[in-house]
């Protein structure tokens, strides 16, 4: 299940206990990141700027 975000960069996110799913406004593709803990998913959902959170805590750290 994808959760819509109020973000100029990210349209929706999801998490299944191990994988984080991210869909950006610029693409219909849903990107999958493996080994992402709940704390990162929750931080992304609750962030004032999900795009900034994504770049600081997810991009380049999870594949």
What are these regions (language model features)?
Residues 1-63:
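Acidic/histidine-enriched, beta-strand-rich ligand/metal-binding domains
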């Amino acid at each position: 299940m994808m959760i819509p975000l109020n973000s100029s960069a990210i349209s929706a996110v999801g998490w299944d206990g191990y994988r984080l799913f991210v869909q950006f406004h610029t693409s219909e593709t849903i990107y999958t990141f493996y080994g992402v803990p709940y704390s990162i998913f929750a931080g992304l959902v609750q962030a004032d700027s999900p795009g900034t959170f994504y770049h600081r805590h997810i991009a380049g750290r999870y594949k």
